[in-house]
Amino acid sequence: MANNTGSDSKNTLYCSFCGKSQHEVRKLIAGPTVFICDECVELCMDIIREETKSTGLKSADGVPTPREICKVLDDYVIGQMHAKRVLSVAVHNHYKRLNHSSKTDIELSKSNILLIGPTGCGKTLLAQTLARILDVPFTMADATTLTEAGYVGEDVENIILKLLQASEYNVERAQRGIVYIDEVDKITRKSDNPSITRDVSGEGVQQALLKIMEGTVASVPPQGGRKHPQQEFLQVDTTNILFICGGAFAGLEKIIAQRGKGSGIGFGAEVKDPDARGVGELFKELEPEDLLKFGLIPEFVGRLPVIATLTDLDEAALVTILTEPKNALVKQYQRLFEIEGVKLTFTADALTAIAKRAIKRKTGARGLRSIMEDILLDTMFELPGLEGVEEVVVNEEAVNSGAKPLLIYTEVTKKKDATAS
């Protein structure tokens, strides 16, 4: 009903869907012979949003299949196929468990995940990408800042507070979220021997994490507990929150190698070269007892039944990381130069040289950006003030010997320079 009859309402327009007049709503949008108000538009958007969520690329039970999860991970993370498969299956089973928890008498246990791998190999990126795929609240916590309650540092409950903030204080949504705890190898037991001094940042933190990882109703202060002690607490059940712990575990490979050596005494003893296999190969033979020797307490290891090990990134993988993923570094810098109207090109030799420098630094993929910044810093400083630059070419000399990248000028600029001289 676009118009109502009557002398007073001759010039008044009405929403064709809900019948409200233009004076009762904030906005009335006109179409051919019909009108729609802003309230009806919002209602339609909500309906479409709900439909999109329920009819996405999902398996029969409403959860992405492991193959679908792995395929999306491939777009962002290069290599690490074993870790991707382990994560895909674990996450699929976790959310399948939530969706079918009330349909059977059999209670399915939660499977938290432990990611072990050298720095810069993709542990954090895997966790972030998983949260993006599943459209659930996600938060990251640094285990090195955590302490037992009552000591200087962050309480374990602050992790749940960050998850609540990520879900815009929607408790139900937060209770299905993902928490990634980084640097978990830094909270290992400081010593096997009992000490007079309390270990508040090592074993103490492991003990504090046990309850929220297993499942408990945590009382979370919305504004942080220490500065606002009088506020009301929110109750958050952590039973269905998926915890992913990650760490480099430097030195763990030596414990694994030592266990695998066996006896080294006698004429029949087998002599093995400790450097014959890489860190990634040794991590594949990881047993829970190795983590106990490293300094994790048995109860903490027991809360992390799914273990995914990641390997060092080789030269070919680093070159691929530079060029192929959706947010590849080369694509990012090319976009920056494109804004200046300049094409940025890297030669194949230059990309290989950058990968070699990253391997030498032992920083993995994380070190690639700092190397790129070093190479392009002077060029990015001078480029906005230069005229007629058409292309910047980064070659092997620019990476290895500190030479400036090549600047290619347009033909017009070359002719101007020739006539001026």
UniProtKB/Swiss-Prot annotation:
Q: Where is the ClpX-type ZB domain?
A: 3-56
The residues that hold ATP are: 118-125
UniProt GO MF annotations: ATP binding; ATP hydrolysis activity; ATP-dependent protein folding chaperone; protein dimerization activity; unfolded protein binding; zinc ion binding
**One cellular component GO annotation, for this chain's record?**
HslUV protease complex
**Intrachain S-S bonds:** none
Record-listed Zn(2+) binding positions: 15, 18, 37, 40
* InterPro entries with a match to the protein in the record: AAA+_ATPase, ATP-dep_Clp_protease_ClpX, ATPase_AAA_core, Clp_ATPase_C, Clp_protease_ATP-bd_su_ClpX, ClpX_bact, P-loop_NTPase, Znf_CppX_C4
Q: Give yes or no: UniProt keyword DNA-binding.
A: no
UniProt cross-references to Pfam families, sorted A to Z = AAA_2 (PF07724), ClpB_D2-small (PF10431), zf-C4_ClpX (PF06689)
SMART domains documented for this protein: AAA (SM00382), ClpB_D2-small (SM01086), zf-C4_ClpX (SM00994)
Q: Which residues form a coiled coil?
A: none
GO BP annotations of the record are: cell division; proteolysis involved in protein catabolic process
The subunit structure is: Component of the ClpX-ClpP complex. Forms a hexameric ring that, in the presence of ATP, binds to fourteen ClpP subunits assembled into a disk-like structure with a central cavity, resembling the structure of eukaryotic proteasomes.
Briefly state the protein's biological role: ATP-dependent specificity component of the Clp protease. It directs the protease to specific substrates. Can perform chaperone functions in the absence of ClpP.
For this entry, the protein name equals ATP-dependent Clp protease ATP-binding subunit ClpX
Organism of provenance = Cereibacter sphaeroides (strain ATCC 17029 / ATH 2.4.9)
Record gene name:
clpX
